């Protein structure tokens, strides 16, 4: 074992590290004096290294000659063999000369050169062999490179152009494939670059050889001459000069890193992308490390200050041996994952340290994690962007090549298949094997022989390569899937012949392309599709073929007319359109073509009768969704078949089924999204059995009525239900297992009548008067039950009051009740039942809540499978309670603000001048106004909590005084579409079913009873609502909201009437919003930074106590570790509270010996997984010899080599930890100083200069000097008086705390000054509406994904289970994209312009909201598995989703562990009429507003897409599946291609070319929907009322989803939209808003008019 030393004899240390020593990389020989023994050892070592270099020169030369031979045989020979074919494809002789230049001359030179090398080094290289003269002999011949290098750029440009021609691209790929190279390893560009890379590599190799060749070696002078000669050769060629400079820069950098391990930089990287200093947390240590990001590699090092051991030197200088850094670790970026860390996080990987500006790096090869922290948010962003760019560059290139290669192989496979099926060839036939017949197969050796015969290949190796490529890409397979492709008598079969082929050609995406084109063509204001006359006949809704080609070229969809014609043929072949007289295939001519979908809508179809595959309505349903958890033995109910319907036969008393509200005789429509009412009864029983065996909760859709009559026994002694509220009174809670529950009474039902008399406008007491128990016993009448409540809030409130009464010693009865409540089943049901037989009945007429209106449709898909669609609208549950909680959070936030401001006012009572008086007066008025707002919010919250009916907010008809409902979303409904169909066995894909004329079979059910065929279930969810708006009357005099709001000093407010006309984006100046946000952010940052700083102090004190108390050895550490693991990492209470409790945050620093390096990446066994050599260096020795150094501590008093005084006896690892902690503390102090010195603080002082504070800005800034003095005191303490270190630290922290408090006070005043109280009220109302709708939409999509029903990737045949898991992982990693689509008309409707200006501001504020998840311990509410809690302030609101244990366990581990999700909100808006020619003066401004909104949103969506793309390109994040390349192409490349295409279209809509604005129409609406749907967004569609426009848009989007993902025939798209629009559940929304006027704009494009009722007979 060789220990590292600081320097090398002869000054060659740097060089040592630059090239790996095969025995001990980076290790230097211990210099034990200048004796002869040491010199001999050194000489032996140099010769050993020389042998390594000789081997490398010979090995790489052989590889290089192999590459040149491959280029010659695979490309040049092949092109010459097929001259005519090549020329036809575009590879003329001239093009070939440009591409390959004189590469054959280079090959001839290198054949001779290799022979000369092998002759010199025969038989095997030895260290005494001489090589220099070989290079000198060939130096003139290397001039052959001049021609090649000067031509290289031209060759690359030509190759880019040729690659645009599909036939050339396919031909070049096939050359590579037949040559035996895996097409995706290196592109042709890479091979063409290899001669330049090789000639540049020679000087580097010779330099290394010269370094290892001792002066006495006979080869020494020749090697030196050869090095100079090769440098001269390279410097004479410009291209190689540039390449050399790059390589030398990498080599130079590597030479500065001591102890380098693994392959050299110049071997695997081409450029340095980013470098910088970061804090790294791993294995309990915080260290400062220098990081270098290259393409393919991340390296991190420790910075060297100076030679270890020298006490006097204090300046940071280079080490004697020239190195600046000490190697610490490397990770190949192929195996590296990066995860963002929210500021303020403290978890296992950060070892309890609070992370700011940080991210995690995961080495998946070794499953090792560490955390990196940058000094600023900007620097962090720079690093994350660079890492994403590096990954994109690497993966995108590979994916593109894989796609091209796949397409080429698929086409070749199809061509060969048709040739082999020819009767003359007769290769594919039934063959005998032993006693059986193997149908439709061919033999490997016959196949290769035939390929040779027809000239497809020139040698047998090429045939084997082609066969293997066909096999790997899923075109052929061995008949029993046992063998790879062999040139032997082995049987293979084309997958076309046994139905296992999955088509993945570009045309496979024709369905989504066709739907997209149809929507875009029909969204134009100037239609291309219209009625046209020809020969005295009018053809309806047609377009000439040539016009379509022109349009496709103008829009950029196709590059050439040929490509456009191919797309047109694809559309005709796949059932989108046809020639009007069925006479011609699609051509670039003036013949008319029509979309089938238009025929179906306009009745021009020759076949008007309904066909079997048309979209048909099956049944209308009104139902309620029940959630039933499994019990010990069953679900608590039985079913039976009655009149071909599945009905409930019996329900157990007190069971969870009864609690959910299940009643005997009710029809069941669906169980866990399976439409059981369409199945045979035996299969329904099987479904229930399967669900129970896997202990899954049941989601039942059960028939119900809007109003029901319930008969309840009137018992004289107890009440088994509770009633609250008035007008109408409602059921607050029902006792579990009681008669009322058995009769069907459920919490939340509104009571309309009692015994026939109307009680709708009465209160709860009037209803209860009808019951004996209440009349006789009043409040004591409640029985001892486990109560099931209406909402979680009710359950919590009841529990709290119960606990309060239990604590009261006089409440004996309450205690008994509590005990009974915890027991179960709580009630002896026997005697009660006999009682109630004779007892009189009370009849209640109740209004049911949470009803779901649904419609079931069916159609036969393109694959011939019968599909069912259940479409429902649902009112979002709990939206009133959620609004109330948001208002309570706002009120609490305001209360703290008012309290702080009043405290501050009280501090400074002296009023000196008039400006002081005015400022004070303004502040008092504002505080009073905020106080009134708090009271209002509290009152509204109480109103909303008790509100039950109606369970949603209707569109208001006219303005009204402000009330609680103004904070709830209007007409908010969640539109669910559940699609189910049998999973088909893999069959020939769409494009091939047409080519081969095979009919896919209808998949029937398994004849065996109890065995179910697998089904596919998918749920799609879109919310419709009225755009959030402010429709309140101006505040009247004396009204609480009206006071103090009209003073001119309040900024933008200019009287209420003026404000009513405009929205927030106009009223709130961007600058005002930004400065207010900046004040609030700074205030919060200071708070957080101060808490964190105190945590570091606690950690340092803890560390010092372990150092200075040697008596408490291992046991102390062990208890510490235990305590640390049991405490939460970040306490919820403030630092002051924590110190009051006498507790401190403990962080365990106990680290196993072998982990004391940088997180194990750096120790011998964890080096880069692709290292070419093993490290034997003693990791602990090397670590303790050169200790951690910090730029913060690298001052005169404290260098990295300084040690604490000996009498403290601190072990070196503890010193390292102390350095790390102090480093972190000083980092925090620096960041606090930076915040307090920043421009925001200066602005706050400027704004509040009229308020008499104790100090001016100058005095305030001088306080920083105290902190600087405090720091130098700490450094002196470390050096001279370590016992006093805790006191020095305490002094520093006290100074900082005072400094921060002064800053926060100033910010409070500035905030008060710039707050506009009236606008804040409006902002709150609109924000609340948007947030509540967003939360309800996300929660519906989340539950679908947790139940494995979410799937936005159905068109790629991905299962809902995989897609759901992927989406959950995606949102955990990248956040939630919220897509809001607005169909408002700002140019023509003044109110809608105001709405648009309001929501633009508000939706951007949603980006500050975070979602997190907790587990629900116990649930006393039926049929809900999620409820919400709100924390935080307006600027950082946190929504906590409480999920039941079943769903919580399915969350990604990151979310289970408490990580939060961020919202990314995008608003796309488009008016549904052409405003270009409108005379209205505001139309241009409205158009500009839409343009700005869309541009900003597109940028956000593209940013999200970049993050998502990076996430999916991480191989390890994809579902682990050992399938072939083909599946990966399907589920990764095709979706990415589609997203790229959609982004391109969106850019053309948002930034149209000059003069092309009219040609894009309203296409932005369907395209933005598809883009966001594919990105996994939660979707919300809004218009003025949430009725006409938004509901039609949803119907269109749902029909498009069915066509893209679920095989709806293209001709049925508009038919489906029309039926869903006019007969679907959304007609209920119109029924609920009868007097509200809303209609489609007059000039709406054709797509939105086709489904409207005809006006005057015109469609």
UniProtKB/Swiss-Prot annotation:
Residues with the Phosphoserine modification: 319, 1001, 1195, 1200
Entry's localization field: Cytoplasm, Cytosol; Cell membrane
Phosphoprotein is among the record's keywords: yes
Amino acid composition bias (Acidic residues), ranges on this chain: 805-819
UniProt-listed Gene3D superfamilies: 2.30.42.10, Dbl homology (DH) domain, Pleckstrin-homology domain (PH domain)/Phosphotyrosine-binding domain (PTB), Winged helix-like DNA-binding domain superfamily/Winged helix DNA-binding domain
Segments forming domain DEP: 421-496, 523-597
Residue ranges annotated for the PH domain, each copy included: 271-392
UniProt-annotated stretches for the region Disordered: 1-40, 796-819
UniProt keyword annotations, A-Z: Cell membrane, Cytoplasm, Guanine-nucleotide releasing factor, Membrane, Phosphoprotein, Repeat
Tissue spec: Mainly expressed in peripheral blood leukocytes and brain. Expressed at intermediate level in spleen and lymph nodes, and weakly expressed in other tissues.
Keyword Phosphoprotein in record: yes
PROSITE patterns attached to this UniProt entry: DEP, DH_1, DH_2, PDZ, PH_DOMAIN
Biological-process GO terms, alphabetical: actin filament polymerization; G protein-coupled receptor signaling pathway; intracellular signal transduction; negative regulation of TOR signaling; neutrophil activation; neutrophil chemotaxis; positive regulation of cell migration; positive regulation of substrate adhesion-dependent cell spreading
SUPFAM superfamilies: DBL homology domain (DH-domain), PDZ domain-like, PH domain-like, Winged helix' DNA-binding domain
Functional note: Functions as a RAC guanine nucleotide exchange factor (GEF), which activates the Rac proteins by exchanging bound GDP for free GTP. Its activity is synergistically activated by phosphatidylinositol 3,4,5-trisphosphate and the beta gamma subunits of heterotrimeric G protein. May function downstream of heterotrimeric G proteins in neutrophils.
Name this polypeptide is given: Phosphatidylinositol 3,4,5-trisphosphate-dependent Rac exchanger 1 protein
């Amino acid at each position: 074992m060789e220990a590292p030393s600081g320097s090398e004899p002869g000054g060659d240390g740097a060089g040592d590290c630059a090239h790996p020593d095969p025995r001990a990389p980076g290790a230097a020989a211990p210099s034990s004096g200048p004796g002869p023994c040491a010199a001999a050892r050194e000489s032996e070592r140099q010769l050993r290294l020389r042998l390594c270099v000789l081997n490398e020169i010979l090995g790489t030369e052989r590889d290089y000659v192999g590459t040149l031979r491959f280029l010659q045989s695979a490309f040049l020979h092949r092109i010459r063999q097929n001259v005519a074919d090549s020329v036809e494809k575009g590879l003329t002789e001239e093009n070939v000369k440009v591409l390959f230049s004189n590469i054959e001359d280079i090959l001839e030179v290198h054949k001779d050169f290799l022979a000369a090398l092998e002759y010199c080094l025969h038989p095997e290289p030895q260290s005494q062999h001489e090589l220099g003269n070989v290079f000198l002999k060939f130096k003139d011949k290397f001039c052959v490179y001049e021609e090649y290098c000067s031509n290289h750029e031209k060759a690359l440009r030509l190759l880019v152009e040729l690659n645009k021609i599909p036939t050339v691209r396919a031909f070049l790929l096939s050359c590579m494939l037949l040559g035996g190279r895996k097409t995706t390893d290196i592109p042709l560009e890479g091979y063409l670059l290899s001669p330049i890379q090789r000639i540049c590599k020679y000087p580097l190799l010779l330099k290394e050889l010269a370094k290892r060749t001792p002066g006495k070696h006979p080869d020494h002078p020749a090697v030196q001459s050869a090095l100079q000669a090769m440098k001269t050769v390279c410097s004479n060629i410009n291209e190689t000069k540039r390449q050399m400079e790059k390589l030398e820069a990498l080599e130079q950098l590597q030479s500065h890193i001591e102890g380098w391990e693994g392959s050299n930089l110049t071997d695997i990287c081409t450029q340095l992308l980013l470098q910088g200093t970061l804090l790294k947390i791993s294995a309990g240590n915080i260290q400062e490390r220098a990081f270098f990001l290259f393409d393919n590699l991340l390296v991190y090092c420790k910075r060297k200050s100076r030679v270890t051991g020298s006490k006097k030197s204090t300046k940071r200088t280079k080490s004697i041996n020239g190195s600046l850094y000490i190697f610490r670790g490397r990770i190949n970026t192929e195996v590296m994952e990066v995860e963002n860390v929210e500021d303020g996080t403290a978890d296992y990987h950060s070892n309890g340290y609070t992370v700011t500006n940080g991210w995690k790096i995961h080495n998946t090869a070794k499953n090792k994690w560490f955390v990196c922290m940058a000094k600023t948010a900007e620097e962090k962003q720079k690093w994350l962007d660079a890492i994403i760019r590096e990954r994109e560059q690497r993966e995108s290139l590979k994916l593109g090549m894989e796609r091209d290669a796949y397409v080429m192989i698929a086409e070749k496979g199809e061509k060969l298949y048709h040739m082999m099926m020819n009767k003359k060839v007769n290769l594919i036939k039934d063959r005998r094997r032993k006693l059986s017949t193997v149908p439709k197969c061919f033999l490997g050796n016959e196949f290769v022989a035939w390929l040779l015969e027809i000239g497809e290949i020139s040698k047998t190796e090429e045939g084997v390569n082609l066969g293997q490529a066909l096999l790997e890409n899923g075109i052929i397979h061995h008949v029993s899937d046992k063998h790879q492709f062999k040139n032997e008598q082995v049987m293979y079969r084309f997958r076309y012949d046994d139905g296992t082929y999955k088509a993945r050609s570009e045309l496979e995406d024709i369905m989504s392309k066709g739907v997209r084109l149809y929507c875009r063509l029909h969204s134009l204001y100037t239609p291309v599709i219209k009625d046209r006359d020809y020969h005295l006949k009018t053809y309806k809704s047609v377009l000439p073929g040539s016009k379509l080609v022109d349009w496709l070229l103008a829009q950029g969809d196709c590059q050439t007319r040929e490509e456009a014609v191919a797309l047109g043929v694809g559309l005709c072949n796949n059932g989108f359109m046809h020639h009007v007289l069925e006479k011609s295939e699609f051509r670039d001519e003036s013949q008319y073509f029509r979309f089938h979908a238009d025929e179906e809508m306009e009745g021009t179809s020759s076949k008007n009768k309904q066909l079997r595959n048309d979209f048909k309505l099956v049944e209308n349903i009104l139902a309620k969704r029940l959630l039933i958890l499994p019990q010990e033995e069953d679900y608590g109910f039985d079913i039976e078949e009655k009149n071909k319907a599945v009905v409930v036969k019996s329900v157990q008393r007190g069971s969870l089924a009864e609690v959910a509200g299940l009643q005997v005789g009710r029809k069941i429509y669906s169980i866990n999204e399976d439409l059981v009412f369409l199945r045979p009864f035996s299969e329904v029983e099987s479904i229930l059995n399967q669900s129970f065996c896997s202990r899954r909760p049941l989601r039942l859709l059960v028939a119900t009525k809007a109003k029901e009559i319930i008969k309840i026994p009137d018992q004289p002694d107890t009440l088994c239900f509770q009633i609250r509220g008035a007008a109408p009174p409602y059921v607050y809670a029902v006792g579990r297992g009681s008669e009322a529950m058995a009769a069907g009474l459920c919490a939340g039902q509104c009571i309309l009548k009692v015994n026939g008399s109307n009680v709708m406008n009465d209160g709860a007491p009037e209803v209860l008067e009808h019951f004996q128990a209440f009349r006789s016993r009043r409040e004591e009448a409640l029985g001892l039950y486990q109560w099931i409540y209406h909402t979680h809030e009710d359950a919590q409130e009841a529990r709290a009051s119960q606990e309060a009464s239990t604590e009261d010693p006089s409440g004996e009865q309450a205690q008994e009740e509590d005990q009974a409540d915890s027991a179960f089943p709580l009630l002896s049901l026997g005697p009660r039942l006999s009682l109630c037989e004779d007892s009189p009945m009370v009849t209640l007429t109740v209004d049911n809540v949470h009803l779901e209106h649904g419609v079931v449709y069916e159609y036969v898909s393109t694959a011939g499978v019968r599909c069912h669609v259940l479409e429902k609208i649902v009112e979002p549950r709990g939206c009133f309670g959620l609004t109330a909680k948001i208002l309570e959070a706002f009120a609490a936030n305001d209360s703290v603000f008012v309290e702080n401001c009043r405290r501050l006012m009280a501090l400074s009572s002296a009023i000196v001048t008039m400006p002081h008086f005015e400022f004070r007066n303004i502040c008092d008025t504002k505080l009073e106004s905020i106080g009134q707002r708090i009271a209002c919010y509290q009152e509204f919250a109480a109103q909303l909590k008790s509100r039950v009916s109606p369970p949603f907010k209707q569109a208001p008809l006219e303005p009204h005084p402000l009330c609680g409902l103004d904070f709830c979303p209007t007409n908010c409904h969640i539109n669910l579409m559940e699609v189910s169909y049998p999973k088909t066995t893999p069959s020939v894909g769409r494009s091939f079913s047409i080519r081969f004329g095979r009919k896919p079979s209808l998949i029937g059910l398994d004849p065996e009873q109890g065995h179910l065929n697998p089904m596919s279930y998918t749920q799609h969810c879109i919310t419709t609502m009225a755009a959030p708006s402010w429709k309140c009357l101006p505040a009247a005099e004396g009204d609480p909201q009206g006071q103090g709001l009209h003073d001119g000093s309040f900024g933008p407010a200019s009287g209420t009437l003026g404000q009513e006309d405009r929205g927030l984006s106009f009223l709130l100046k961007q600058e005002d919003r930004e400065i207010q946000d900046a004040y609030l952010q700074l205030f919060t940052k200071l708070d957080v930074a101060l808490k964190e700083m105190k945590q570091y102090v606690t950690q340092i004190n803890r560390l010092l106590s372990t150092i200075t108390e040697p008596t408490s050895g291992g046991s102390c550490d062990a208890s510490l570790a235990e305590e640390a693991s049991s405490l939460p990492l970040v306490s919820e209470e403030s630092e002051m509270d924590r110190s009051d409790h006498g507790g401190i945050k403990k962080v365990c620093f106990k680290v196993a010996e072998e982990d004391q390096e940088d997180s194990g990446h750096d120790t011998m066994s964890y080096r880069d997984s692709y290292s070419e050599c093993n490290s034997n260096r003693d990791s602990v020795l090397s670590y303790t010899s050169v200790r951690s150094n910090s730029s913060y501590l690298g001052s005169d008093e404290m260098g990295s080599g300084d040690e604490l005084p000996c009498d403290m006896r601190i072990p070196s690892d503890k010193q390292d930890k102390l350095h790390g902690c102090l480093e972190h503390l000083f980092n925090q102090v620096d960041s606090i100083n930076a915040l307090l010195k920043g421009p925001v603080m200066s602005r706050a002082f400027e704004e509040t200069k009229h308020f008499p504070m104790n100090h001016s800005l100058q005095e305030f800034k001088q306080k920083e000097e105290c902190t600087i003095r405090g720091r130098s005191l700490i450094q002196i303490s470390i050096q001279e008086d370590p016992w006093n270190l805790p006191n020095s630290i305490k002094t520093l922290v006290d100074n900082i705390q005072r400094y921060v408090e002064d800053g926060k006070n100033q910010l409070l005043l500035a905030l008060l000054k710039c707050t506009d109280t009236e606008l804040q009220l409006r902002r709150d109302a609109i924000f609340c509406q948007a947030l509540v709708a967003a939360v309800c939409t996300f929660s519906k999509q989340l539950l679908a994904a947790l139940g494995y029903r979410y799937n936005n990737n159905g068109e790629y045949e991905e299962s809902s289970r995989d897609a759901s898991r992927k989406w959950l992982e995606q949102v955990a990693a990248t956040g939630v994209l919220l897509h809001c689509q607005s169909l408002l008309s700002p140019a023509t409707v003044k109110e809608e312009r105001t709405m648009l200006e309001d929501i633009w501001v508000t939706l951007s504020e949603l980006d500050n909201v975070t979602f997190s998840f907790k587990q629900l311990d116990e649930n006393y509410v039926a049929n809900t598995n999620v409820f919400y809690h709100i924390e935080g302030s307006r600027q950082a609101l946190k929504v906590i989703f409480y999920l039941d244990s079943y769903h919580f366990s399915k969350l990604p581990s990151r979310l289970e562990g408490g990580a939060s999700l961020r919202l990314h909100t995008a608003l796309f808006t488009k008016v549904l009429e052409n405003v270009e020619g409108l005379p209205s003066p505001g139309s241009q401004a409205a158009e500009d507003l839409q343009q700005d909104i869309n541009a900003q949103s597109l940028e956000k969506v593209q940013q999200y897409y970049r993050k998502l793309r990076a996430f999916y390109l991480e191989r390890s994040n994809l579902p682990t599946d050992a399938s072939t390349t083909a599946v990966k192409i399907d589920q990764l490349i095709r979706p990415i291609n589609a997203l790229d295409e959609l982004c391109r279209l969106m850019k053309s809509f948002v930034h149209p070319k000059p003069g092309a604005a009219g040609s894009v129409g309203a296409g932005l609406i369907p395209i933005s929907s598809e883009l966001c749907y594919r990105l996994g967004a939660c979707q919300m569609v809004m218009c003025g009322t949430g009725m006409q426009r938004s509901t039609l848009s949803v119907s269109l989007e749902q029909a498009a989803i069915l066509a893209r993902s679920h095989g709806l025939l293209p001709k049925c798209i508009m038919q489906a939209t029309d039926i869903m629009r006019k007969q679907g559940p959304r007609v209920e929304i119109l029924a609920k808003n009868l007097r509200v006027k809303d209609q489609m704009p007059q000039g709406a494009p054709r797509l939105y008019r086709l489904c409207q009722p005809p006006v005057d007979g015109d469609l």
